[in-house]
């Protein structure tokens, strides 16, 4: 009997392209392993920028450029007084902090946030952890030498790692407020790797390669190692339902370093926690600001 194959109508061109692209990557990975690793590096550490639109500035927030050794970054500032610097995580942006910044401005602080290289309207390039640390050092140093001076730092996600790995002279004895911190950077990267939907062989090859690179280049940056020296003036805010980073990691750290305060929220997930009322109240307290007359809202008011 003649064998037949049932074809489901017209072939899907997109699927065919994906099929051949993965085949090509698989073959290239066998003959030139570094090629695959470089391509995956680009996918992992270069945020998508095709849909980025100019930021619509909220009322009272100024936008300007900071020139660093590696490129130009977009910065945003409001208020007058001691400066609180906000540091976003991978894939985030300065805009995430606008409501908190507006609130701090009403409390007599200068609030400054910036887009890391590769993010927002800053220069486009791979956004590695080392690059983020270098940029943060530049910003903190600039603020420290400004008229208002550096008062405190607020980080979110991998931005918490960035702050803890900044130059100690810039961080020591200043209040740190860390939101949804990533305590396991290796696991964080491997989770991102899986989400790329690559061929299993490519994932395995890159995971093995990254594990070796992690030991030599990234392990020293892990938050539990570097935050310990600042634990007595750090407050961590973490949501119990956070799917990006488990709250158990924050609980474990605070159990080991009991002077570190821990705020656990409910139903605000990894991102919405930033501009929650609970975080706002704890932030004021952490900065020793007790005036309860300042109203806070997560709603952004534009020009």
Predicted feature locations:
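Gly/Ala-rich beta-loop-alpha elbow adjacent to hydrolase catalytic centers
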Residues: 154-163
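Alpha/beta-hydrolase active-site loop
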Residues: 126-145
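Short beta-strand/loop motif that positions the catalytic acidic residue
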Residues: 230-231, 236-238, 242
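Hydrolase active-site cap/lid region
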Residues: 168-213
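Conserved alpha/beta-hydrolase
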Residues: 94, 101-123
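An N-terminal hydrophobic leader/cap segment in hydrolases
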Residues: 2-65
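Short alpha-helix in the alpha/beta-hydrolase fold that links the catalytic acid
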Residues: 100, 223, 232, 246-255
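Catalytic histidine-centered segment of alpha/beta-hydrolase-like enzymes
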Residues: 268-280, 295
């Amino acid at each position: 009997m003649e064998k037949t194959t049932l074809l489901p109508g017209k072939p899907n061109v997109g699927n065919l392209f994906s099929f051949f692209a993965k085949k090509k990557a698989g073959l290239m990975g066998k003959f030139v392993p570094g090629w695959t690793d470089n391509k995956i590096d680009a996918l992992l550490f270069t945020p998508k920028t095709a849909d980025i639109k100019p930021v619509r500035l909220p009322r009272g927030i100024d936008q300007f450029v900071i020139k660093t050794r590696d490129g130009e970054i977009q910065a945003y500032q409001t208020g007058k007084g001691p400066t609180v610097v906000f540091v976003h995580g991978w894939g985030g942006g300065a805009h995430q902090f606008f409501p908190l910044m507006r609130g701090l401005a009403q409390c007599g602080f200068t609030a400054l946030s910036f887009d890391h290289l590769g993010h927002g309207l800053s220069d486009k390039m791979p956004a590695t952890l080392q690059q983020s640390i270098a940029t943060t050092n530049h910003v903190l140093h600039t603020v420290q030498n400004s008229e208002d001076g550096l008062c405190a730092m607020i980080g979110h996600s991998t931005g918490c790692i960035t702050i803890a790995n900044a130059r100690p002279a810039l961080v020591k004895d200043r209040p740190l407020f860390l939101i949804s911190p990533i305590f396991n950077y290796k696991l964080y990267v491997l989770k991102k790797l899986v989400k790329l939907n690559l061929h299993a062989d490519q994932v395995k090859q890159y995971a093995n390669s990254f594990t070796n690179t992690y030991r030599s280049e990234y392990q020293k940056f892990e938050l539990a190692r570097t935050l310990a020296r600042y634990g007595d003036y750090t407050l961590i805010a973490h949501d119990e339902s956070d799917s990006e980073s488990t709250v158990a990691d924050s609980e474990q750290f605070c159990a080991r370093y009991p002077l570190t305060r821990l705020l656990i929220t409910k139903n605000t997930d990894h991102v919405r926690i930033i501009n929650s009322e609970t975080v706002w109240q704890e932030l004021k307290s952490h900065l020793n600001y007790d005036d309860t007359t300042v109203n806070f809202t997560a709603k952004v008011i534009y020009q």
